């Protein structure tokens, strides 16, 4: 399927088409850090001169702005971006968008492709799937983009979604830095918190942040910033609840101290890695930072990996893929093979993981394992005619057991880890929406697909 080579070919072919009075400008949305050298390869193989930029959220804001300004000013340019393309980055007008692999949600898809064609009023997007699974998801996204109300066996998710209390952690930090007195009181949080958040929960948040060393008790009924909060503020990490873990390591220029990026990986002195297409070497490190300098004449040991939450394909996208296959809402397909059976549930990553856990708990044999193949499919040790009866207690038990695994799917906010554990769990549970899962479970039916559908389903095994 498609990849970086296909993107280069597409850029070369598209360059020959008329573009009016403007030079052609591309943005490629992809997991840029997964490629060891996206910028050098594009520069080497493009059959025309073009400025090539790399943009992702873990870059320091100053470096991101430099990339945005450079792309906006260049007459012919390619910007290889991660999901930052959907966040409204200021990179000027874009003629075309290429997607190497599909984004997880319809909103992400529309935001990414919507960045292109604003000068002409015509959206031009090149979808490059790397597997039959991605091809099916692209087809589902394109279908939903034309008719964004999918047929689901249950009502759509509630709107607005449940409140994420991690916002209150970020707001506490921000209030403290804006406070003329340098202190925050419970009443300050009460003014910005939703009515459903009780005063007791607000006090728990403040006390927990104190125990973690971000706050300290001041005068009667007030809290002041402590050392760990000062360190976060110095790194400008307190002003948004969106993005990477605020406690991640900083990658800085070894001599100027300029912040370059964030990562969750500690490195040893002398190690080399690629960052934004540049080869860098670690020359010193301390508790929170890695000091780096440019390194020449040697291969990179690997590309720097960043702290990013894994994306989850949601229920509506997975159900749209089922619709593309010809299944009705709520239908599952069971395909027998030599090792057991494949259950194509089309429930997405989150509910697929919970379904696997529920079915696993129903098995008596300890050596019978239910495996998740992807967002649409489970491998079962044997077939089944229908799902076991719904068990509310078992569902709660499995959610609690799975929570460390599924929590990154829930987009709980970058300060979620600083909430009191009980409050953090309840916030995550609200995002799971067990009542909705129960509706989906009870409405499910299992069918044995005919031969043609069976072959199409087997292409989605991954």
Question: What are the residue ranges of the model-derived segments?
Answer:
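Short, amphipathic alpha-helical interaction segments positioned at domain boundaries
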Residues: 228-256, 301-310
């Amino acid at each position: 399927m498609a990849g970086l080579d296909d993107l280069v070919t597409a850029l070369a072919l598209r360059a020959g088409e008329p573009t009016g009075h403007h030079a052609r400008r591309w943005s490629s949305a992809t997991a840029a850090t997964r490629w060891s050298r996206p910028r050098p390869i594009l520069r080497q193989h493009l059959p025309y001169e073009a400025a090539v930029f790399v943009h992702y959220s873990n870059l320091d804001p100053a470096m991101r702005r430099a990339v945005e300004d450079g792309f906006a000013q260049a007459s012919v340019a390619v910007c290889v971006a991660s999901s930052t393309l959907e966040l409204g980055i200021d990179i000027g007008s874009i003629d075309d968008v290429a997607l190497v692999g599909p984004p997880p949600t319809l909103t992400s898809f529309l935001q990414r492709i919507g960045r292109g064609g604003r000068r002409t009023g015509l959206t031009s997007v090149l979808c490059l799937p790397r597997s039959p699974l991605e091809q099916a998801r692209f087809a589902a996204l394109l279908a939903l983009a034309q008719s964004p109300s999918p047929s689901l066996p249950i009502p759509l998710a509630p709107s607005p979604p449940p409140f994420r209390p991690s916002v209150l952690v970020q707001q506490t930090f921000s209030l403290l830095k804006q406070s003329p007195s340098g202190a925050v009181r419970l009443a300050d949080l009460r003014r910005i918190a939703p009515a459903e958040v009780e005063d007791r929960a607000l006090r728990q948040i403040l006390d927990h942040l104190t125990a973690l060393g971000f706050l300290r008790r001041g005068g009667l009924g007030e809290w002041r910033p402590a050392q760990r909060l000062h360190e976060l503020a110095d790194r400008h990490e307190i002003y948004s609840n969106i993005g990477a873990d605020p406690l991640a390591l900083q990658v800085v220029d070894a001599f100027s101290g300029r912040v370059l990026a964030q990562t969750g990986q500690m490195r040893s002195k002398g190690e080399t890695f690629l960052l934004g297409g540049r080869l860098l070497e670690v020359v010193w490190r301390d508790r929170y930072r890695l000091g780096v300098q440019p390194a020449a004449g040697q291969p990179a040991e690997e590309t720097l990996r960043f702290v990013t939450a894994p994306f989850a394909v949601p229920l509506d996208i997975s159900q749209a893929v089922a619709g593309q296959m010809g299944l009705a809402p709520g239908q599952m397909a069971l395909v027998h093979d030599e090792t057991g059976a494949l259950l194509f549930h089309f429930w997405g990553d989150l509910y697929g993981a919970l379904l696997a856990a529920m079915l696993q708990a129903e098995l008596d044999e300890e050596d019978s394992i239910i495996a998740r193949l992807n967002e649409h499919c489970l491998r079962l040790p044997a077939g089944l005619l229908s799902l076991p009866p719904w068990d509310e207690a078992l569902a709660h038990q499995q959610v609690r057991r799975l929570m460390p695994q599924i929590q990154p799917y829930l987009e709980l906010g970058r300060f979620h880890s600083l909430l009191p554990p009980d409050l953090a769990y309840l916030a995550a549970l609200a995002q799971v929406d067990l009542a909705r899962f129960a509706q989906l479970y009870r409405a499910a039916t299992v069918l044995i697909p005919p031969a043609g559908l069976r072959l199409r389903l087997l292409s989605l095994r991954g």
